[in-house]
């Protein structure tokens, strides 16, 4: 049997570079070696593309020591990786690309744009859905137009804030009640997110968020449970059982996710049937609204007192580490990790084949 050549992208110019490496290592260890030839491609924090030549089990933060310069060609007549060694270029055919890039410059439509140009099938959402879901401000505005329930929010741009700081602080304090969350609009793994309980903390939180983006969100804090839902599919959509995150800290921060490791994941989440059904229906509606494909993890809040459901965000390349909710939810729902990867690759190929019927010329 001819093996499919699967290029796995990891790293990236992102605050989630290290998390991406852990996710990609997990993906590559669970890909069926009888079906796939794995081509590990790392992107450094500086944006250099390198073919990783070491062992998958040894992949860590020192991966660049075992690498060769490379890049994916945007030439769709090639559909290949270009390996550069001793000033000579060699083309390596690629059948599918599996981007395991979290955050900016990987999950935001940028890499997806390159892969569209290349014509190579790739796992996950396309350019538009990736960009929309990565930008929490646009995602919330679009969800608002469709009547999807969510907490009160305000979008602030850095240049406007710097010229009118007092105005924005007054506006926030008039529209919201403490505590509030302050988030970079384009960030993941809770990087740059703070919970502010008073004016002093608010000012510090805004400063922190602007370190990671030029656009931030102010969100009303809700006394809520954090519920996550895994979604799989293109036109036919599968929604997983629901999971609950019980943070070890005040909220599910970067430290709570990846450093202290003591946050609890409950699968399935213990919810009333009506609430569970509402979340699953909303997940499908949101998945279709953002034109997602392949996969996404959609996160919600459930008010602890009223059971009211609120949309939080969509992750188009969810974590694939050993502690990540997406593969755990799918496994609980009857799709083991290796089969999940098979399905994602199959969905990528199917989506690419559908595009082959699109005409790009009036001739012929």
Swiss-Prot record:
Keyword Transcription regulation among record annotations: no
Note on cofactor: Binds 2 magnesium or manganese ions per subunit.
One record GO biological process: cell wall organization
Necessary cofactors: Mg(2+); Mn(2+)
Pfam families for this protein: Dala_Dala_lig_C (PF07478), Dala_Dala_lig_N (PF01820)
GO molecular function, one term: D-alanine-D-alanine ligase activity
Coiled coil (residue ranges): none
Entry binding sites for Mg(2+) 2: 313, 315
NCBIfam families: D_ala_D_alaTIGR (TIGR01205), PRK01372.1 (NF002378), PRK01966.1-4 (NF002528)
Family stated for the protein in its record: Belongs to the D-alanine--D-alanine ligase family.
Protein name: D-alanine--D-alanine ligase
Origin species: Caldicellulosiruptor saccharolyticus (strain ATCC 43494 / DSM 8903 / Tp8T 6331)
Gene name of the encoded protein: ddl
